Amino acid sequence: NVDFFDPSTKLESDEKKLLQKWEINKEKKIILMPGRLTSWKGQELFIEAVNLTKIELGYEAFHVVILGSNQGRDLYKKKLVRLIEQYRLTKQIKFVNHCKDMALAYKVSDIVVSASIEPEAFGRVAVEAQSMEKLIIASNIGGSNETIINEKTGFLFESGNAHSLSKKIIKAITMDETSLKLLGKEGRKNIIKKFNVEKMCFSTYSEYKRLLN
């Protein structure tokens, strides 16, 4: 819904409240990885890439928020925590179980990552992030190939490759603000063009018509 995921509808006061709740300083870049905690969503790969990025850029360069419930997958969550501890990333990576306003979560972030290691038919995160004018970094499988214009509205990385993901994160973090905002604007234009209600209704109607004929 491009009207709900619209950056102009979010208040600065609400952004500040969310950042206070998350105990995050906005002076650093914020990388958001939304999605339930499950192995195929690629959280392990993402943590590996964050470690590689930290080695390249240093501890102080960015914050990371992994946003999503483990839905009872306690062993998997513990595995992720151990990996974070192993890489000494506990001060940099924060788990957030739930956010009732996902559009606001995107708004306070600078970069959004979708690191799925199995293809997703649609890939909602990539669409929502672009709609919120945020740079999206996603694996080059599944729906992301269709919804992201590589290097124009986001970055695609080689699926399953932590080094490839890290390179894209570093590229995003080191972009100047003007380029970052321009890329975000292109992302929203892309999503409005592809997914406005009238176009989706027409596409659905055309598909039904084709099937009936």
Locate each region found by the language model.
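Conserved acidic donor-binding segment of nucleotide-sugar-dependent glycosyltransferases
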Residues: 150-151, 155-162, 171-177
